[in-house]
Amino acid sequence: MKNLILLMLLLFISCNKNSISDSDSRLTFVASEGNFGSSNASISVYRGNDQIQRVSNIGDIIQSIKVYNDKLIALVNNSHLIKGYSITPSGLSLPGIEVSTQNSGPREMVIVDNFLYFTNWNSSDIKILNLDTYFIEDSIKVDGSPEGIVSDGSYLWVAMSSGSTIEKINIETKQIEETYEVGNGPQQIIIEGNLLWISRTYYSSDWTEIYYGTSQIDMLSGIVQIKQYDTGIVCGGDMMKINEKTYRTFEGGVAPLKPDLTINRIAKIGSYNINSLYSADAHDDYIFMGTTSDFNGPDTVYVHNELGQNIYTYIVDASPGDYAIWEISN
C-alpha cells in the first residue's frame, strides 16, 4: 500500500510539473488601451500566472496587438503609430521600432506574406507595411471608416463600420472586387472554413439605443445571412474562435453562434457584470475577458480554459482591450 501511495504521489507531481511547464512555455501579452489623450497605454507580459514585464506609456490608446514570428506589433490609435518589438523569453526588447502612420488613426490589422495590412479611420484606407523594412509601401482607399480586417490568403475582407458593407479586396491588384451588404455597423470579422462571420453594433439616430446583430457571408457562394437581435440583448462586438467554433461577447461572457446566427445561451462561458466586460478574445486554449468598472486602472483580466474554468487572473492597467500569445519554443 505504501508503494502504491508513493507511486500515485509521484504521478501527481509529474503531471503537475507538466501542467506548469505547458503554461510556462508561452508568453501572454495584454494591451491596456489607457485613457484618451493621456498617452498611458501599456502592455503587460505574463508567463503563466506571473507578470514578468510591463511596458508603460506606450502612447495614446493601443487599439490592437498581434504576434508575428518573434515580433509583437501594436497599433496606437490616437498617437498614429505602429510599434514593433522583438520578443524573447524575458519579454519585449526595448525600446523597439516606431513608425508614424501620418495621423491616420490605425485600428485593426492582418498579416499576409510579411506585409501588415491595417485599417485607418482618419485616412479611410488600408495601409500596407513591409515587415522587413518597416516602410509603409502603399495604401488601398475605401469609402468610410474601415474596422475589422481578415484574409483568406488571396483577398482582404474589410468591415466598413461607418456603413453597412464588407469589402472584398484582391491582395495582388489592391482593388475592391466585391461589396457585400451585411447590415448596419459591421465591426469584427472572423473566418471559419468558408464562412465569414461579422459582428455588428450600431446606434439609434439620437444615440440613446444600441443595437446588435450578426451577419455571415458564404465566401464561395456569396450568400449573405443577416440576424438582428432583440432590443435589450447586450452583445458587444468581440468575436473569437474557440474549439474551431465562432463565439461572440454576450451578456457578460462569450457564447457560440448557431448556424442560424442566433446565440447559444446555454454554452456561454463567463458571467461577469454586463457593464464591466470591456473586451474578450481567445488564443490557443486561453479565453480572455477584460473588465473595467471606471475605465481607470488597475483593471482585471480573467483567463479561462476551453472548459470555461478561470485559470489565471491578471491585474493590468486601464481598459484591457487586446491579447496575444507567443510560444517560447519558437
Regions found by a protein language model. Give the residues of each.
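Bacterial Sec-dependent N-terminal signal peptides
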Residues: K2-E33
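Conserved beta-strand positions in repeat-built beta-propeller and related beta-rich domains
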Residues: R26, V30-S38, A74-S79, F118-N122, ...
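Structural motif
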Residues: G37-S44, L81-Y85, D125-K127, T165-E167, ...
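Short loop/turn segments that connect beta-strands within beta-propeller blades
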Residues: R47-N49, S86-G91, N130-Y134, N170-K174, ...
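Beta-propeller fold detector
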Residues: I52-I58, S93-S100, E137-K141, E177-V182, ...
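Blade-loop segments of beta-propeller domains
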Residues: Q53-V110
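Repeated scaffold domains used in trafficking and secretory/extracellular systems
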Residues: G59-N69, S104-D113, G144-G153, N184-G193, ...
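Intrinsically disordered, low-complexity segments enriched in Gly and acidic/Ser/Thr residues
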Residues: Q228-G297
